[in-house]
Amino acid sequence: MAPPLLSLPLCILPPGSGSPRLVCYCERDSGGDGDRDDFNLYVTDAAELWSTCFSPDSLARLKARFGLSGAEDIHSRFRAACQQQAVTVSLQEDRALITLSGDTPALAFDLSKVPSPEAAPRLQALTLSLAEHVCNLERRLAAAEETITSPKKNTQPAGTQFLPELDHQRGSSGPGVRRRCPGESLINPGFKSKKPAAGVDFDET
């Protein structure tokens, strides 16, 4: 049976800008009856794999010892520890010790080295899942950058939003402009133009 898909979150150790040496992640397997209590923590250096290798009985004993209600509690604690960079791992021969600390009491788990035939498909699944997550993040980042850099399209033609509406005003005077009556003086509006002077007739007696 193929290994289950990677269940985020995960973390790399040591945290920060240094070169990573270990990857810590978790898997939740669903049983045939839909039970989700099959839960394991994993640590890998990309060559070897360590696992908690929980059985239903050992997981039940772990929950009773730490006062946990279910595997979901371990998953949420692991997520919180990853976000707070509060995960530590110690490798010892064929075993590893992982500690989850942070804002809650620390939880410590013993991990055993997974045999190579079983570890190989799990490491392959981890690599493919990480590659898929990276590709999805790159696509989302490219879409976000395109949205930010592309100007919003304006459906109204450029230059028309500031033009006055002149069509209905053509052939009519604008507001406050009075039409000149025939014969009205151009110099003194409102007064009729006078007739041209006829001069003085000196021959008239």
UniProtKB/Swiss-Prot annotation:
Phosphothreonine modified-residue sites: 147
Post-translational events: Phosphorylation may inhibit interaction with the DNA-bound XRCC5/Ku80 and XRCC6/Ku70 heterodimer (Ku complex).
Record field: compositional bias (Polar residues): 147-159
Region of interest (Disordered), residue spans: 147-205
GO cellular component entries: Ku70:Ku80 complex; nonhomologous end joining complex; nucleoplasm; nucleus; site of double-strand break
Annotated ranges, domain PISA: 39-81
Any one Gene Ontology BP term: double-strand break repair via nonhomologous end joining
Keyword annotations: Chromosome, DNA damage, DNA repair, Nucleus, Phosphoprotein
GO molecular function term, any single one: molecular adaptor activity
Gene disruption phenotype: No visible phenotype in normal conditions. Mice are viable, grow normally, are fertile and have normal lymphocyte development. They however show mild radiosensitivity. Mice lacking both Paxx and Nhej1/Xlf show embryonic lethality caused by severe defects in classical non-homologous end joining (NHEJ).
Location(s) in or outside the cell: Nucleus; Chromosome
Subunit composition and interactions: Homodimer. Interacts with the DNA-bound XRCC5/Ku80 and XRCC6/Ku70 heterodimer (Ku complex); the interaction is direct. Associated component of the non-homologous end joining (NHEJ) complex, composed of the core proteins PRKDC, LIG4, XRCC4, XRCC6/Ku70, XRCC5/Ku86 and NHEJ1/XLF. Interacts with POLL (DNA polymerase lambda); promoting POLL recruitment to double-strand breaks (DSBs) and stimulation of the end-filling activity of POLL.
Domain notes: The N-terminus (residues 1-115) forms a head domain that is structurally related to those of XRCC4, XLF/NHEJ1, and SASS6.
Function statement: Non-essential DNA repair protein involved in DNA non-homologous end joining (NHEJ); participates in double-strand break (DSB) repair and V(D)J recombination. May act as a scaffold required for accumulation of the Ku heterodimer, composed of XRCC5/Ku80 and XRCC6/Ku70, at double-strand break sites and promote the assembly and/or stability of the NHEJ machinery. Involved in NHEJ by promoting the ligation of blunt-ended DNA ends. Together with NHEJ1/XLF, collaborates with DNA polymerase lambda (POLL) to promote joining of non-cohesive DNA ends.
Similarity comment text for this entry: Belongs to the XRCC4-XLF family. PAXX subfamily.
PANTHER family for this protein: PROTEIN PAXX
Record protein name field: Protein PAXX
UniProt source species: Mus musculus (Mouse)
Gene name per UniProt: Paxx
